Amino acid sequence: MSSLHKSRIADFQDVLKEPSIALEKLRELSFSGIPCEGGLRCLCWKILLNYLPLERASWTSILAKQRELYAQFLREMIIQPGIAKANMGVSREDVTFEDHPLNPNPDSRWNTYFKDNEVLLQIDKDVRRLCPDISFFQRATDYPCLLILDPQNEFETLRKRVEQTTLKSQTVARNRSGVTNMSSPHKNSVPSSLNEYEVLPNGCEAHWEVVERILFIYAKLNPGIAYVQGMNEIVGPLYYTFATDPNSEWKEHAEADTFFCFTNLMAEIRDNFIKSLDDSQCGITYKMEKVYSTLKDKDVELYLKLQEQNIKPQFFAFRWLTLLLSQEFLLPDVIRIWDSLFADDNRFDFLLLVCCAMLMLIREQLLEGDFTVNMRLLQDYPITDVCQILQKAKELQDSK
């Protein structure tokens, strides 16, 4: 470890040990990258995402309160409905019209159950393929949720719901328009394998199952947006960071802490996932156009070239912005970018500058390429040095 790196760690420790955290100083340090040693990144993210307050003295009580609240969410939205499902229609004599699966009432328990299953199946499909370049999400967590996995419990878990649902032979997708599409697979095709569940023994669960639970709870608590594909790519790096915290006391509560940090982050970016807001000033279309207007201001030649080739920002910047660049770089590089995004006062204005910097750093290739070549460049971004990209974005910010 270099003396410079040791000095940076000491600077973070000095800020974080104060009774009242100096937020501006923490932002300044974090913007240049947060060391992963000693759980510094995990702690800084929790502060920068407004999960932990600046007053250290209140941390213990707030964490206890939030973690108990999350446990209550699990009981209300997974355990109790699971018990109700297990009990619904057990005895033919006990079945009421309200309990009947064919009850057309949209507020009936069965109708709610079926709608939840549609959301759950989409989440399940998406979280299974999280970060396929690493094995982390397929491995067992050291801290499985005992509330869910207690062998004494006799209720339908999310795992059982996915295995048993009558919709499992269908592909269910909810797009940003809020439309749910279902299509049965071809007779000869193999449905999505559920054997991944069998890899881990009873009492264990994979990290992706934890992420599935977080997203399901979020969808239940936020019915206006529920779950939209891509949210898994936002929660994944958060959970990975917290679940690999070297401090076991923090790592043990990675699920609850991730949920609340994800919720706070989504409060800032959720408009990107709502199609009806696309053309508003808070919508994704406005932000994509802002990338191009910034490019026009900083590099008019490149801007005109992209315009001439009719390369619209929707073709590439939609994914860049909506998923916070989580699909453009390897996970460690995404985490480094997020250090700067979370640390910046106007973090999602800075994201626009990062996108503009990405364009300018490959300007020569773009100026020389035709439409096909340039689309390939933009959809499979060639530069892997994220520090170079962040430095360029900071230059753009400082030159305003």
From Swiss-Prot:
Subcellular location: Membrane; Cytoplasm
GO biological process, one term: intracellular protein transport
Annotated InterPro entries: Rab-GAP-TBC_dom, Rab-GAP_TBC_sf
Gene Ontology MF term list: GTPase activator activity; small GTPase binding
Gene Ontology cellular-component annotations: cytoplasm; cytosol; membrane
Cysteine disulfide partners in this protein: none
Main subcellular location: membrane
Keyword line: Cytoplasm, GTPase activation, Membrane
Pfam families, sorted: RabGAP-TBC
Rab-GAP TBC domain sequence ranges: 35-345
Function in brief: Acts as a GTPase-activating protein for RAB35. Together with RAB35 may be involved in regulation of insulin-induced glucose transporter SLC2A4/GLUT4 translocation to the plasma membrane in adipocytes.
Subunit structure: Interacts with RAB1A and RAB10; in a GTP-dependent manner.
Protein known as: TBC1 domain family member 13
Organism: Homo sapiens (Human)
